[in-house]
Amino acid sequence: ILKRLSGRGVRFVVDATGDLLKNVLKYKPFLVKPNHHELGDMFGVTTQTDDEIIEYSKKLQVLGAQNVLVSRASKGAMLIDADGKAHKIGNATGKLVNSVGCGDSMVAGFVAGCIEKGDYAYALKLGSACGNATAFSPELATKDEIINIFNTGFNSQKGVSL
């Protein structure tokens, strides 16, 4: 499918790992979203620090990824955007209820933020709010829960550019 769409101006997101992710990078996905363990595993290393995540995310960009969004469990998330700029955001304050769907919610929020504002820092914060709101809910989060976390849950974090 990606081969057929390549070169037609279609932007796509890949939330996959290992060889599957490596094999689609040549089609220049708009966004890939590994977690920090998956990112390290792809290169046979451990990625824990900001510098390590930036280094290996940029390697994914050299291979074709435009934006690399790395979820980091309790440490929040980092984004290396298509301009090569690194951003990070912590998690919102709340109680973990359910981790199922958090990554998918983060991706959806990030894409929505990019479409809405075209601003990577905003998209990272919205994606993180969606992922956190889902984590704090027994099911997928509601729009009101997401808005509340976006506005108050990060203690005024906007996403820090590194």
Model feature map: region roles:
Residues I1-D51:
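Conserved beta-alpha-beta core of the PfkB/ribokinase-like small-molecule kinase fold
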Residues K3-R8, K22-N23, D50-L162:
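Conserved phosphate-binding/catalytic region of the ribokinase-like
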